[in-house]
Each structure stands twice: as C-alpha cells, then as structure tokens.
C-alpha cells in the first residue's frame, strides 16, 4: 500500500482547537429579540451548567448540577446581591447532546429588554463571557455536530425570506449537499488509491491496478455531477437575491401602475404626464414562494431633458442586468420595434405586455411565435394572475423541496469550479496517456477543493472568522 498519507481524510487545523473554539469556556447571549413575550438566553461551555447554577435558585433547593440532560427546571434567577431578577424555566443539555456539542443551558424568562440584560449581566458576573457572533454554531462545527457547509446553512435558514430559500437552506442543513460531496469524495479516493498503488509498484511496469478506460468513465461521471452543482448556482443566486425583472417601455404606457399592481402597494408615482418616472424604482414580492425583484424604469423616448436622459440610460442598464424583461406596450408595435426590443433583451426572457385593454380596442394576437404576450389592464388589475404565471414560468425555477441541492454560496461555487477544472485535467491526462503520478496530483487537488466546502482539511482561522462573523449573536 502507499506510504503517503491521504491528508484529505483528516481534519488538520492550522490554528489550535482551543483558540478557535475558546477552549470550551462558558459563553452566554440572547437567543431571541428583546421586548417579546418570552426571551431566551443561551449558555454553552464545559462549565455552562455550573455557572448557570450559581445564579439559579430552584424550587425546593434543587441544583442544576444534579440535573439530567434534556430536562426542564423552574426557579428564579438572582443577581450577585441575591435579589430576584425573574421567574424562569431552565433547560439543561449535557454534552454531546446539545446544539454546540457542549454542556448547555437555555434560560426562558419574560422578554423585557431590562430583564434579559440583567440575566446576562448576572451570568457574566458568575463567570460567563459574552458570545461573539456565530460562536455557538462555530463551536458546533468544531465539535463535529455539523460540517462547514451545514454551519453556513444555519445563517441561510435564519435569513430565509421565502419558501424557496427556506427549503434550500433546510436541505443543506440536513446534509443533502454534504452527502453529494461525500459520494464524490469516495469516488475520487478510489481513483487516487488505485493510482498511488501503482506508484508503489513502479518497478514492475507490467502492473496496472487502475484500468484507464474505467478511470476516464468515472472521471467523466464526477465532472457531470460537479457541473450539475455549479449550474445550479444561477438559480441559487436568484432565489437568494430575488429574480431581477425589468419593466421597460415607452412613456405613459402604464409601467408604474403595473409595478404597483405587482407589489400590491402604491410604490411608484402614477401620472398622465410623460416622463414622470425619471429614476429606477425597485422592490420585491413573492410569486409561488419565489422572490422577484421588480425594477420600474424611466420611459424610453427621445428627450432633451438631461435628468430624464440619465433615467433612460439606467433603464438600459437595468435591462441588461435583468433575467426577465417585461415590455409594456399599449398599441401594436411595428416589426422594427419588435426586432429592436428582442435585440436589447437578447439572452433574457422577454414578455410583451399589452396594457390598457379596458380602454382600447386591441387586436389580441401574438407579436410573433417566439415572444410570449399577455393582455392586461394594470389599472383594473385584469389578467394579473396570468401575468404572474408567465413571469414565474420565465424564471424557470425547478421544483424545490427540502431534498433539493442548489448552490447559493459563492464560496461553494468557486471551490466546485476549481474542482471541476482539476477533474477535466484528469480526463485530458488520461486521454493523452500521461503517467499515474500526474493524474493523481490533479485528483488530490480536486479532493482538496471539495473538502474546502465542508471544512474537512486545513482551514485557516481567517476563513472560519470570515464565515462566522456574518452570523447574529446568539447563533
């Protein structure tokens, strides 16, 4: 067997665990927003139960230090002078059966900001320190309760603003993405071990443990799986930030009225005066659980007004940034106008919207076979449901469940892209019949890139800090 150690199968940290995780010292912080009916304060660390017990007075004198894990206890929290702060319920969790994998307590009390602050102060006086943003989840990662991609999913789950982002974050937190990476890693390790076995017996040129045809087929399978993941990133970005939809057209065709209609609120000023909208107006709304970011733009026309000209320039810019373009018209456009709009919206999903069907006689026909057309009255909110359906279909969002694996992180996308580049070099090397040591090197690079995502190899303190600093305090 190879004498080389597969470093990708180990977790090797460049910074000691005790520094990264605080050595298990007790930390505390609010886990809920203040001023609610109920507030929760989380405590975690090797001595978390002992520290909480110092400020807790249980009924009939019971001590938390004697309590079993996963139990609930009623009593009072006292300040350092022994005065009652509030009646509380304390949940006790013993390692490793807690969120962080450490001994933990959660104190439920009344949600007054004053009470919560006094309880935290009492805990700090008893030996806790204030937790840093994301420190609980960082400790959960360091203690093996979750991998790095799952830890990032916690932040995504908290930030989820619609059904789609919630499902994607939940899938990642449950480990579906990690499972995909684990399968890829197993296949890569199999290839690497066979090639390195050949290197150990390099004196026997007639020996070939790894069939090159089978290796290439496996490498191509890995490439296809990685490509499916990287291709999902565009969908992931759209789900997180909202699918950008530009509303364009001439002045006074009803673009602002349509925006207000889609948003279900009076966001844009509506007027019969040409050129009323001079700047870009943006807002979001949900259609079928997916967030869409609608962008109302200045009416496109020839003008000498310099401010209006700037607005029109921004309209073209926003059209270029959009995934979907809604072309609002209130009369039959010429063939030249259709061609020009299709040119401007090249690479986008373009939908023509005939507005004002309540006040104009319009020949209801498609502009051409390639251009979807919807007939509406934004003023009277007629056929808006049909328009929303057309917008949703244009977004081409796949059916999303809690088992869906969709990439939403730029960090994950970058690592997968580099991994794919490595596996493509493997395929090329096998095509040219290059030696096993060269092929093996690119396989190791691919493994390292995939392991970067889950934190299963060298992970500098700076990388962890950058990830966890975006969490809220209490997570």
Regions found by a protein language model. Name each.
Residues 1-167, 171, 175, 351:
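A glycine-rich (often HGG/GG-containing) alpha/beta subdomain
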Residues 7-30, 163-286, 303-305, 334-475:
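C-terminal-of-GTPase-core extension/linker across diverse P-loop GTPases
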Residues 33-35, 83, 99, 239, ...:
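Conserved catalytic network of the ASCE P-loop NTPase/AAA+ motor domain
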Residues 74-86, 90-94, 275-303, 321:
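Switch I (G2) and immediately adjacent beta-strands of P-loop GTPase domains
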Residues 263, 298-299, 323, 330-331, ...:
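Short glycine-/small-residue-rich Rossmann-like dinucleotide-binding loops
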Residues 294, 328, 353:
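Generic enzyme active-site microenvironment
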Residues 308-331:
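Inter-motif core of Ras-like GTPase G domains
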């Amino acid at each position: 067997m190879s004498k080389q150690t597969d470093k990708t199968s180990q977790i090797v940290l460049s910074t000691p665990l005790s520094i990264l995780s605080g050595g298990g010292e007790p930390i505390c912080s609010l886990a809920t927003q203040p001023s609610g009916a109920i507030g929760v304060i989380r405590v975690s660390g090797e001595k978390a139960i002992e520290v909480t017990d110092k400020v807790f007075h249980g009924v009939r004198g019971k001590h938390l230090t004697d309590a079993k894990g996963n139990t609930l206890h009623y009593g009072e929290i006292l300040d350092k002078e022994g005065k009652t702060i509030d009646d509380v319920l304390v949940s006790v969790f013993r390692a490793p059966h807690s969120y962080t994998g450490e001994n933990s307590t959660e104190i439920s009390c009344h949600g007054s900001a004053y009470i919560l602050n006094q309880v935290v102060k009492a805990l700090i006086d008893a030996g806790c320190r204030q937790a840093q943003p994301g420190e609980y989840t960082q400790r959960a990662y360091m203690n093996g309760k979750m991998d790095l991609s799952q830890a990032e999913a916690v932040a995504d789950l908290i930030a989820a603003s619609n059904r789609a982002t919630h499902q994607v974050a939940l899938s990642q937190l449950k480990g579906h993405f990690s499972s995909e990476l684990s399968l890829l890693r197993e296949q890569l390790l199999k290839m690497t071990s066979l090639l390195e076995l050949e290197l150990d017996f390099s004196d026997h040129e007639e020996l070939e443990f790894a069939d090159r045809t089978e290796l290439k087929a496996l490498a191509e399978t890995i490439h296809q799986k990685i490509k499916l993941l990287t291709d999902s990133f565009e969908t992931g970005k759209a789900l997180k930030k909202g699918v950008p939809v530009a509303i364009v057209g001439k002045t006074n065709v009803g673009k602002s009225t349509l925006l207000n209609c889609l948003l279900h609120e009076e966001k844009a000023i509506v007027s019969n005066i040409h050129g009323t909208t001079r700047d870009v107006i943006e807002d979001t709304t949900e259609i079928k659980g997916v967030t869409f970011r609608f962008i109302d733009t200045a009416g496109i026309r020839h003008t000498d007004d310099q401010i209006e000209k700037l607005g029109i320039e921004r309209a073209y810019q926003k059209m270029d940034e959009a995934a979907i373009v809604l072309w609002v018209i209130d009369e039959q456009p010429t063939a030249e106008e259709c061609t020009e709009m299709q040119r401007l919206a090249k690479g986008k999903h373009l939908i023509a919207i005939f507005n004002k069907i309540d006040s104009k006689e319009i020949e209801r026909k498609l502009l051409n076979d390639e251009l979807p057309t919807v007939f509406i009255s934004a003023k009277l909110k007629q056929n808006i449901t049909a328009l929303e359906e057309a917008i949703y279909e244009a977004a081409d969002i796949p059916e999303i469940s809690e088992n869906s694996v969709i990439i939403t992180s730029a960090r994950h996308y970058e690592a997968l892209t580099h991994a794919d580049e490595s596996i493509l070099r493997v395929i090329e090397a096998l095509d040219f019949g290059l030696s096993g040591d060269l092929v093996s090197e690119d396989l190791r690079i691919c493994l390292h890139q995939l392991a970067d995502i889950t934190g299963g190899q060298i992970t500098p303190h700076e990388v962890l800090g950058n990830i966890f600093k975006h969490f809220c305090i209490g997570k």
